[in-house]
Amino acid sequence: MVDHTPAPGAKQGRRGVVEAAEMFRAAFPDLKITIESLVADEERVSVTGKMTGTNRGTLMGAPPTGKTASCAYMDMYAIANGQIAEVWHVEDLAGMMRQLGLLPS
């Protein structure tokens, strides 16, 4: 699997996607992911939604803030032979970091 938008310093492929998800889940143990739109055909799946959680763990080197924050996300997957072959994902992490007080407003 090819990840076209890996997190900075993340490994490529499935392992990198899993590690990024584990880091995010550790930073937001009560993470709730809401799907707002899902469109699919035989070759592509596109998803948009919102992630919300309370920052109780380290996030990108920053200590926990205890604040709740949310961010919009968009994911697109290319499917080949019934499996995810490619992934593109975009999250409003800057907006989330501002809500947590980790970036200026």
Where on the chain are the PLM-derived regions?
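C-terminal and inter-domain tail/linker signature
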Residues: 1-105
